[in-house]
Amino acid sequence: GAGRLPSLAAQAAPLDPTGDRSELDGLAEAAFQAGGGGEKAGLGTSMHSWLERLTLDPDGTLSKAPENAVADLAAIAQCLSDNNIQVYETPGRRWVEPFVITPLPAAQWAAGSPDMIANVQGCETPAIVDLKTGRDPRQAPMSPAIQLAVYAYAEWAWWAKDEPLEAAPEKREDVGYILHAPFGTGTCELIELNLEEGWQAAWLATYVRVARRDMKRFYTFPEEPIELTDFQKQML
């Protein structure tokens, strides 16, 4: 983006990385959009909506898909077939993008929607399967492992505002799967993640988040009040 618009680099050159962070963030976003990053990210996001159609009717979906997505969708369809990935179904439910809710320690909760709960490679117990169209999750595996672990340990599912919560199905809690299909590459790879490690990291992150909410407990206040810095006041 900065290569297309040299003025962005010129504007950034005199700025201080610490003191001028907001201005630098704005220039970085402008460079991202100028480089086509926003369009690419949007097209990658649209792949999630095509995924459900692909699991129902691969050939029909490919015939209706936009030209710039056909190669990627064909690769995803081939990966689904090669690994015998079948969307899990229960009476009246097809477990694609369910909204699931997971209890966490310290009376916390997490919720979200995996792309699908599916049987993978013939395993009778379904697993979490999520599509990623950006960078290789193996470059920074902790975040997706936490995300998929939270989905895998979900206890409830919620389908619509006028419907009550229902129990989430039994799922594999040891592993989850990423369909890694970087947009525009025409490739798709199934990546297995260790969700037992992801779940431990989710607990750790929860405790850290709770601890940071109540910073006052880390102070031992004297009888006479002390003058706090502006930063300390913000944290309290």
Positions of PLM-derived features:
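Glycine- and charge-rich intrinsically disordered segments
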Residues: 217-236
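Metal-dependent nuclease catalytic cores that hydrolyze phosphodiester bonds in DNA/RNA
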Residues: 1-111
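Short, charged low-complexity intrinsically disordered segments located at boundaries
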Residues: 78-85, 185-194, 231-236
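Short linear sequence elements within intrinsically disordered, low-complexity coil regions
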Residues: 53, 156, 212, 223-226
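Acidic-enriched, low-complexity/disordered segments with a strong bias for Aspartate over Glutamate
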Residues: 16, 20, 25, 57-59, ...
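Intrinsic disorder/low-complexity segments enriched in polar/small residues
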Residues: 12, 122, 233-235
